[in-house]
């Protein structure tokens, strides 16, 4: 777990430097997002999409094209982090928008990616 958290902090450093960096394994694709992010169902890495607040607050969150949509919701790192776990894309295009803050975006699958 210590290496995972350290690597997520490395993703944040890359994001601040303007570098699009991701952690990838057979089950997960992880990146840092802010502002607006579009996910295409046909390009999704796995079945599930999780959003974990990386900042104290992620405000004005809009989720469209998901099983559990949200409108103008505020995530906090101490109170609502589990609300963003294991959502699913239901439309061809899913959109994540936020007015402020930063998420760790985790796309995950139950079965490993086959080479």
Name every feature range the model reports, one short phrase each:
Residues 26-28, 33-115:
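Long, charged alpha-helical interface segments
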Residues 1-40:
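Anionic-ligand-binding alpha/beta catalytic cores of soluble enzymes and soluble regulatory domains
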